[in-house]
Amino acid sequence: MKTLIHILLGTLLFAGSCSDEMPVCTPAVHGPRHVTFTFSCDALPGTRAVADESRVEDINLYLFPANDAPARHVYAASQRTVALELPDGRYTLYAVANLGTDTGPLPEAEVRALRSAWNPDGSDSGTLPMSAMRTFTVRGTTQIAIELVRAVAKVDFSYTVAADFSRSLSVRSVRLCNVPRFAALFGEGRITADGECAATEAFPADDDGYSAVYYLPENLSLIHI
């Protein structure tokens, strides 16, 4: 009986001495995740174009974490794919294409206020300003497709002179007025001063008719010159 008691006490002492050696469970900590962003822009309907309407020459990418961690900015030239390492979490993304320059790190309010300078007679670079904004969540390796939206509208303009008016109406030139000099990328295209609007050059025209393609920024305030 004494032998049995000694065995039981020895077992308890051994178990107690081993309890301090048991590993403590800790939550898993994940490192940064591999996130790939792919940018595209659908072709516009119609066959006529005076700019490469879907071309992406450069991208300014801004990422703002929901937990107020430091924002990320990446400038990518001549590529439609950007790969980053990001911690798990929720983000707000802003992308701007075809500005032709690295806009650098900016606060979110300044990103939302970005505008693209616009020549009323058309794009100087042959490309169109584009942008995108969305939220996304990272929980592992992630691939995100970003659809860019053009910041200007395509207008197919044409006219003909009806036969009844051909003797009394003579057309010499055509020009568009009140064209904004800037295209809003995220906010409303609201012009606030006359100097922010201009007219296109006058294009020779005649009574036989005229047709052209224009790309026009938004003008909500109807400022005119």
Predicted regions, residues:
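Sec-dependent signal peptide recognition
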Residues: K2-L9
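Conserved "repeat-terminator" motif of extracellular CCP/Sushi domains
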Residues: A145-V152, V213-N219
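Surface-exposed interaction/gating patches
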Residues: R150-A163
